[in-house]
Amino acid sequence: MTADHNKNATDNLLLLSSTLQGLTSEGINARSERLDEMSALEIAQLMNSEDQTVAHAVEKVLPAVAKAIDAAHDGLAKGGRIIYVGAGTSGRLGVLDASEIPPTFSASTSLFHAIIAGGQAAIFEAQEGIEDDRAQGVVDLDAANVTEIDVVIGLAVSGRTPYVLAALEEAQKRNAITIGISCNPGSELEQQADIAITPEVGPEVLSGSTRLKSGTAQKMVLNMISTGAMVRLGKCYQNRMVDLNITNEKLRARALNLVRELTEADKEAALHALVEANWNVKVAIVICKTGLDAAAAFDLIQSAGGHLRQALNEAK
C-alpha cells in the first residue's frame, strides 16, 4: 500500500509539473531574465512596462465581462448574491472586492460574499495546501447556502485549482450562474464556467508570482463586474456615488457637495434637504429638484426601483 501510494503521489506530481509548464502564467518572461541583476529603478521600470500590457489583455475579454455584469445585475435584482470563491491571492482579491461594496454603495453586507480556501486565517497568512482540497470546496460552498438566484465567481489564475473547480461544480448543481476568471486559455475553469473571462497577461516578471500581472487583471475584472452591477441597480446618478453610507464628517461633507453639484442648490438649502432626508443623498436631491417633502421623495425613489434618474424623470 505504501509503495503504491508513493508511486501515485509521484505520478501525480510529475503530471502536475507538466501541466504547470504548459500554463502561460507559469512561463518564463524573457524581459526579466536579468531581474536579480537590475537596479531598483530598472525593476520598477520593467514592472511598470509589463503592467501596461494588462489593460490590453483585459480589453480583449470585455464582451465576456459585459455578460458577467448582466448576470451579476440580474442575480442581485432577483434578491440573490454575488459569491466569490478563490484560494491564495485570488481568494484575497475576492475578499477585497466584497468588503468594498457596502461602504461604496451603501449596500447590505450580505449581497457580496467571499469564500477563501482556508477561511479567515488565509486572508493574513498563506494556507496554500487547502487549494488542493476538492471536498472542502464543496463544504464551504454548501455552507454559503447557494441557490439558483446567486452568482458564483470562481477565481483561479491557473484555471485548475481543485478547491475552486469543486465549488463551481457544486454551484452548478444548485443551478447558480457561474463565472470563471483565470489567465490561462483552455483551462478547466474556462471550460466549466457558464461565463468564462480569461485575460491572457503572459508570463510574470517574477516567474510564477501570479499576484503581479495576473492579480492585477483579476482585480480589474472584479472592479468592472461589481461596479457595473451596482450602477445598473441604481446605485449611482451620472457618475456620482449617490448611495453613500454616511458614517463620518468627511462623508457628510461629500454628501453636501454632491447635493449642491447635482441640484445647483446653495449650501444652506442642500444642508436643510439632507437633514430632512436623514442624510439620504438621493432623497435630498429629489427634494431640492422637485420641492417634494422627504416622505414623498423617498416614495418616488422607491417606485423607481432606486434609480434616481428615473425618479426625477417621473417627477417632471
Regions from the language model: what does each represent?
Residues E50-K60, A126, V151-G154:
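Short, basic, glycine/proline-bearing loop/turn elements
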Residues K60-G75:
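A short, well-structured juxtamembrane/interface segment
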Residues A229-K316:
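Short, amphipathic alpha-helical interaction segments embedded in low-complexity terminal/linker regions
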